[in-house]
Amino acid sequence: MPLTEHLRELRYRLIISIIAFLIGSGIAFYFAKYVFEILKEPILKSYPEVELITLSPTEPLFILIKISLAVGFIIASPVILYQFWRFIEPALYSHEKRAFIPLLLGSILLFMLGALFAYFIVLPLALKFLLGLGFTQLLATPYLSVDMYISFVLKLVVAFGIAFEMPIVLYVLQKAGVITPEQLASFRKYFIVIAFVIGAIIAPDVSTQVLMAIPLLLLYEISIFLGKLATRKKKEIQKA
């Protein structure tokens, strides 16, 4: 296919994806206030006395728009992923097509697991520690900006969703021969430190560090295991 045809196809797929995103965001706007109530739950459970306040007349509108865009992207993600698949499908071999779908579904599942883990486990613990530090140690008045709180929640949820993609990324890199399971195994001791540092950045108390580091370490071990399976299968095919 000529380059102009590729660019035309890419443009078409991007337009469809953008339209799906805009439609999804428009639909999500009607449910944004309900999503906001869900996002408020962790802080209300951690510190019921906290009052969420707005700092400008336009802040409530921008908060609803921010939530709508985030939820709209989730709603549109099946369409966006399908357009991505249709764009790259002609360039893939049959065995690559068979491998791509499980990887795609696996990445979606892992992202959702990471987001749910952040919302139900990490967020309440982080809020309890961070707000406790401010309200009890510094004797600060328990008021929080709604916009800053929602931004914090969305960033944390997305960050853990992306972090949970680690097995997929490392599996692909190992399958492509960029890195080996042996290299990952030798890097394990450094990754343990990295996992606990990440936990310390979010909430420096020991129990929260451990709770956040354990899933990352498990995902790392799963990545090594999947890489060993991939390289073993590749060697068997080469021998045959």
Curated annotation (Swiss-Prot):
GO biological process, one term: protein transport by the Tat complex
Keyword Protein transport: yes
Gene Ontology terms for molecular function: proton motive force dependent protein transmembrane transporter activity
One Pfam entry name: TatC
Bilayer-spanning residue ranges: 15-35, 61-81, 103-123, 152-172, 191-211, 212-232
Keyword annotations: Cell inner membrane, Cell membrane, Membrane, Protein transport, Translocation, Transmembrane, Transmembrane helix, Transport
Primary location group: membrane
Subcellular localization: Cell inner membrane
Assembly mode: Forms a complex with TatA.
Family: Belongs to the TatC family.
Purpose of the protein: Part of the twin-arginine translocation (Tat) system that transports large folded proteins containing a characteristic twin-arginine motif in their signal peptide across membranes.
Matching NCBIfam families: tatC
Protein name: Sec-independent protein translocase protein TatC
